[in-house]
Structure formats: structure tokens, C-alpha cells
């Protein structure tokens, strides 16, 4: 097993990331794009943009409340119960397959990895291995149950095949590279015996290849945009494709041609499912409608229901005579809709009869390739909606949690204000790694204005909220930029002028439990300047996910902050932690303060006949009162300079920048950022105070 990717020092520089979140995250926080159902144990596996795979215990269709009886959400008395989470991915979970006779779950992610999980009923340690062969987003997976092979495809243009039977703890790679593929791969399908696979990459080509020989015997054209989903029937003679061009196409593999096209959807079709007999296809996508069409006549369709958000993933509860369908969308809720509801436009008795199609299905009408502005759904669907009531209530719903979708970093470069999909505003402390205040439903801009201060601290971290949670990233270029005094940082310290470094403190917090860091901290003397600069660090919550990654974001190792002291995690960290981290936490090395050049001139109101322009240089954290003291003593040559306390120097000298009077406690970088506002060197004007 491998817990980390290749830790080679070559390539782009490494970064550190951590996620501020609750200890338990039982609900999805954004889009749900991957679904798998274990019918034997009535378990649903769900994954999406928040990086976490969740397991749910769900009732059989006959045990669920009907749509007529109302929606049942996950909760204490709900038939749907959260079971556990599988947490190792660091980016969007794109796909999942159940394999190994239901004992294994294989998942793919935008973090470039394929991960293997043991999901046996009583196994509490689900993670088995990380397969790190891809170098870009892993877009999709396919499973050949008769051959017990898993296939992965990626934006890196590679396709890999893994042997599930080889060993649960050590998947064997059968095909290293699909030669000749020149573009990212968006979709993938295989026959149950892996006799051949279909895949799509740009240039509107669906291509076939034989995984056993790596031969590519055919190409099929027809779609005018990316193909987002592919399905093959069991004998490999027919295929279905769904595209961003809004069409569903049926292909004859032997003839290598498109033999039927469905145009019911007005916008991109992102996901399709087909029953075991390859008789009916279920489709969903950007227009939010979920439709059912007979495969032998894609010109006919039936509207099943309309979702609240674009549909990312469909999953039939059963392949044989499906009674319900699971739906994941751009929202965090997951729903199961009945396919036998009294409110649904049912097929009636004879599903194969022509009369049932003409009675319960509508026929697609030709449409232009570019729909008229303002049309958000096909006109024929709108008319069908008017004629027949849509099913508007799912039989089950697993409610999601709100996701952070907006944020603002406060001027102190320590706190971040966030707003979520329900307009709740909250305040996070980056140094403490936790949420510190909730403001309820308010406008983010209004709270930001209330919390903003006239202080400038250089940026030292990057914020990302694509997972619906707050992710903080540190890199070598900026992490040590934020020097400030303990007074400005708000720390209770006897020496208010002691300098602290936020980035150094953050590294102490992240590695506090790592043995090399603990040893270095213990050996450093209290008078050590770096020790002083980082001594105010916070102890982070132990459940905080912590990731070492390459410069492009590809993960090298993921762990929890609280596990850094464990033997395995400690050893893996030692292999992948970059030098700029170890220099600080092991050797107590920090960059020096940044210097700032500036000019001193007498204020124009002094009517100086030949004003002298002095060019000076000082740390950017130098306070204006120190400049006042220099002017009073050195420039003006006052003999009583030593008798004027520093906290009273403003009674002798005034300082100006761009005609604005400066406060004595303001530092030079704040003056440059808020008052000077130019790229050139800072100009400061002094004027003696007249008694």
C-alpha cells in the first residue's frame, strides 16, 4: 500500500494545505457527482465536490414512504441513516465503482488519484490503497465484472486497467498507456468481459480500443460537443452516448455509425442510465429535467421530474425492472425518485406496445442548434408539463449542508469572512483553524465593512472554497511575508514591539505534533528571535485535514494534524516535507524583515527655501512615531530630543503623506498601502508643531 504519491523533488515547488471544518461532516456540502448502490446491504455511496465519500443505509423501495406521503430526509427517525465517511481524496470525487463481489469500492478524483476502499460490512478501516499513475484529473471509471477489471481514464490522455483479482491490497496495472490518444478523456464504458472499451476525447470522436491488445479499431463521429457519458450493452453491439450538445445517440458498433438520436433535452446531457435489457434510457443534465426514452425510438420521451439544479449523476436502484432512481445534482441534496409513482406519467401495462408509447410519451420536434434567447426548456416539454402533472416530490431525500461560496480576507490577514449557499455569514480564524463567530443571514459586504481596519498586513496564504469548506494553502513565496508586532497582532505580551510571523506560527501549529518539530521547539532558547516570532502559535483541532502537495496541487500525502506524531505518518512527512518548512520548524530559520526605502521632506507649509530630500531605508514595520523621533532629533537637531518621551513625540512633530496626517502608531507599509497608493518610493513630509 502507498499512502503518498511519488515524492520526487523534481518539478514544481511543494505547497501545504489544510481544511477548516467540523470534526464530523456527515452531509455533503456541494455538488454530488458520483453514486453507487450496494443492493445486498442496502447501502448508498455518494461522492462529490467536497472530497468526501459518504455511506448511507437506505430502505428498500417498498419500505420507503411514497411521494404522496411526503419527502423523508436523513435524520434520527428517518429511514435513511448516515453510516460513515471515506476520507482520503483532496479534490472533487468524479466517479466510483463497486467491485470485488461488493467488497471493494474504487473511486476517482480531480486530485489525480484512484483510491481503493474495503467496504465489507464490519470493516472499520476502509482505506486500502492509492493508485497514483495519472498526472491530471481522473475523469471517469468503468468496471468489467466478468473480468474483474477496473478501467480509469484521465485528462492526462492515459487509460489504465487494474486487476481486481490480483490482490485486494495491491492492484496490478495491465495497460500503462493508451497509445495515440492526443486529448483529455471525458467519458468511458466497457463490456462486462472487457472485450472492448469506448472512450471520448475532444474532436467529437468516440473511439474504441481493445484493452487486451491496445488496438483501436474504430472511430465514430456524430456529436458536436463533448460526450459526457457512455454506455455499452453486454454483448458490445450497441452503445449509448450523451453529450453537451444536448443529444443522446444510439450507435451500432458493427456498422460503426449513429443509428438514432434523441433531442428532447434543450441543454447538455451529462448523465445516462439504462436498464438491464437495454430497453429504456434515463437521462439528465443542465436543463434539470430527468427523462425516460425507449432505446429503440429515441424520438419519444417521457418527463419523469424536474430537479432544483442541473443533474450531475443518475443511478437506477435496480437494473432489472427499476423501481426508483437516485439523483445527484449541483446542489448538496441527494434524492430518490419513484419510477412507479401515481403522479408520474407511467407507461401503462404493455411497455413494448406501440399504443403505450403514443399514449404516454411525446415525440421530439426538430429544434435549431441554437435555441432562441430566453428559452430555458424545450417548448414541447413545457406543453407536456401543462398537459400532464409532473412528479414533483421524491420518495426519499438525503439533505445536504450549506456550502461556502463566497469569502473575503480581512485586512489583518488572519480572519476570513464567508457566506454560504443559504446566505449565512461566518468569521474564521486562520491561525486557530476554526470558525469563531456566526452572523446569521447578512450581506457579506456589510459585515466586511464593519470588521475592516486601517491596517496593512502582506498576504501570506491563499484561500479556496471549491469544496464548500475553507481550504488554506501556504507556499514558499508568500508564507513568511507577514511580520507584525505582538501589539498589532493582538497578543498579550509584555514587549509590545516583539515581532511575530504569522506564517511561521502557522507552520508550528500544523507540525506541533511532529517529533522533529517538538524536539526543535524544546531545544530552542526562549531568547531565540525565531522562537519569539512563532511562540504564540495555536494548537489546531486534531481532526484538521493537512495535505502536502506539488506546486500544481497534485497531492503527495494527506493526514490529520492529530496524527502527525504517529510512526507511519511521521515517516511519510519526513519524505515529502519541503525544505522551506524544515528550515523553519527544525532549524529555526526565518527570512529577515522586508526593508522599505522612503524620502523625508519638509512640509510645503514650512516654506523651506531649499528643502532637503533625505532618502532613508527601514523595516516596513517601522512605526511613524519612530520616524518622528528621527526627524526631531537628527533632521531638526533639537538638543532636548532625549527628554521627549516617544509616546509624546506627536506633540513636537507631525507627519503627512499625500496631505493626510498620519497617526504615530501606524507602520510604514500601512502608510504606503492606504495613503501613498503608488508603486514609487514613499514620500513623507514632516512639520514641527507650533506651541
Curated annotation (Swiss-Prot):
Keywords (A to Z) from UniProt: Repeat, Ubl conjugation pathway, WD repeat
PROSITE patterns (UniProt xref): WD_REPEATS_1, WD_REPEATS_2, WD_REPEATS_REGION
Source organism superkingdom: Eukaryota
GO molecular function: ubiquitin binding
A Pfam cross-reference name: WD40
CDD domains: Ubl_WDR48, WD40
Renumbered ranges of WD repeats: 27-82, 88-130, 133-168, 180-219, 222-261, 264-303, 306-347, 399-438
Gene3D superfamilies, sorted: YVTN repeat-like/Quinoprotein amine dehydrogenase
GO biological process, one term: double-strand break repair via homologous recombination
Family: Belongs to the WD repeat WDR48 family.
General function of this protein: Together with wdr-20, binds to and stimulates the activity of the deubiquitinating enzyme usp-46, leading to deubiquitination and stabilization of the glr-1 glutamate receptor.
Summary of subunit composition and partner proteins: Interacts with usp-46; the interaction increases the catalytic activity of usp-46 in the presence of wdr-20.
Official protein name in the record: WD repeat-containing protein 48 homolog
Organism (species): Caenorhabditis briggsae
Organism classification: Eukaryota, Metazoa, Ecdysozoa, Nematoda, Chromadorea
Gene: wdr-48
